[in-house]
Amino acid sequence: MTKRVSKSRRAFTKSMLALPAAASSAASAQPVGANGGPKVLRYAFRVAETGFDPAQVQDFYSANIIANIFDPPLTYDFVARPTKVVPNTAAALPEISPDFTEFTIRLRPGIYFQEHAAFKGKRRELVAQDYVYSVKRHYNPKFKSPRIYLLETSKVLGMPEIRAVAMKGAKFDYDREVEGVRALDRYTFRIKLAEPAPRFQFYLADSWLGAVAREVDEMYDDKEMLANPVGTGPYRLVDWRRSSRMVFEKNPGYRDDVYQEQATPGDARGQEIAARMKGRRLPIVDRVEVYIIEENQPRWLAFLNGEHDLVEEIPYDLANLIVPNGKLAPNLVKRGIRIDRDYRASVDMALFNMEHPIVGGHTPDKVALRRAVGLAYSIDNEIRLVRKGQSIPSESPVSPQTSGYDPAFKSEMSDHDPAQAKALLDSFGYLDRDGDGWRELPDGGRLVLQMATQPDQLSRQLDEIWRKSMSAVNLNIQFQPAKWPENLKNSRAGKLMMWRVGWVAAQPDGDTFLALGYGPNKGQANHARFDLPAFNKVYARQRTLPDGPEREALFLEAKKLFVAYMPYKFVGHRIEAAVFHPWVVGYRRQSFLRSLWKYVDIDNDVKGERNA
């Protein structure tokens, strides 16, 4: 079997290097250039979507889709570096009270939802009450919103009481007026908080606060809402083959919107894009097709063949071929392919269910077990052998590109020390009593680590790194494969012992990562179900402070508590590269803005010439 795999890999590599710029059947069937063919953007996700309701989905891939259909009041400048918040449906940035507890947003008149039967043939204008309603939807228990923790920790006045009544079985009362979120007039709404939230406007720029029309929500049940997105954004869903393909077309009723992004001085690439695209009416691309291709080789070949226009995440196992020594391969450069490379504001990690009887708990023996697992695991092998150098070791969850990140901070989190791991296990009674080569629990019971995983190539490679790392210290680990959405559901419900997962920030604030450990966030951001009073106190305090030395000190304290109790083994922060064909115009990686479709163009003339 090893020889067959090796031969297959050599053949694939050879074909990749020799592949001409020929059109695939899918690409050649599409009219291009002067014959007036539509502009179509095609690419693939490596993980399946879970649905399209801002109140029900959390995963990175579904959030990227939602951002192109639903409009939050604010957004991010597409080309500015560092990132900058700008108005979207709002007429201007919010008016913020000096104590950061009141946020007043005024909307631009004349923005409309896409046509839908719920509106009974009438044009439906976006109004302030739509955002009030959309905020309240997250509090409705029937949606099980994975984002409710962001609002609950922000302490929106009056909403916890409405939610508490609904949690007891009563119908959720959308019509009850509350001080915390209310429309002041047709186009103005205000959010009022019980505590300061200096960075709350970042939430107003995220797609989970995209406007949902009440008429549509009342037309469908919660499951149907996942399949029937109706927003004011630039695109609408026209075809969905679950876990296979999604097709979107321009929203014909989309507002008058022009490209006015502003690059940062000294940013040559950003200035190039902004100058070329300035003043163009958005969106430009007529149609977007997103495919689900879990395996790396077919996803990459679809790009090389011209079937797909870009690859947002180059496959790790092909990184040495695509970006040898950190530079785009010469054969790709000759074809006009370009690359955009940067840190993703993210952390890859393995979680321990802190409520699980084997790996959970705060007692010294349980902490020792988790720390030993962390010390036994080889981050270097993961980054070097699996991710091909496209990551840096994590010392804490807080990622580059977010506040609270300190490149000088060093901790045990990144250490690989099997000898110390063995010593910890020995000291706390995790011994091999029956001579079968595996350690038992201190009471002599069977010790088997069970890690949830996915049936894809990357997961299988990571499984093997984990298996070898644990075997080196005589820990028995077994893997339980399931599709990613199923693992996500089970993790939120506290049904997994361990799971590897990535956490991606939607805003440039390290609070996103500290939220992984906040007790009240169990089942939402806090997949480990960690609940430590000392950590909860630190987390709650830092949320109310403006950025500065006092908040940085609390970040440091929180990081140390993560290391000491090890509810997660934080592994790495990704360095991600996107590659795109020369006919893709205006593309740039963006860590926080998800609605990229409307900012890019497909030059069909160039595509036709390249594929001729």
Task: Please tell me what each predicted stretch does.
Residues 44-98, 230:
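N-terminal lobe/hinge region of extracytoplasmic solute-binding protein
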Residues 13-21:
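Sec-dependent signal peptide hydrophobic core
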Residues 41-44, 450-452:
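Short, well-ordered beta-strand segments
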Residues 2, 6-11, 30-35, 78-79, ...:
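Extracytoplasmic/periplasmic ligand-capture domains
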Residues 571:
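Active-site-proximal polar cores
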Residues 55-64, 120-126, 204-208:
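Short Gly/aromatic-enriched secondary-structure transition segments
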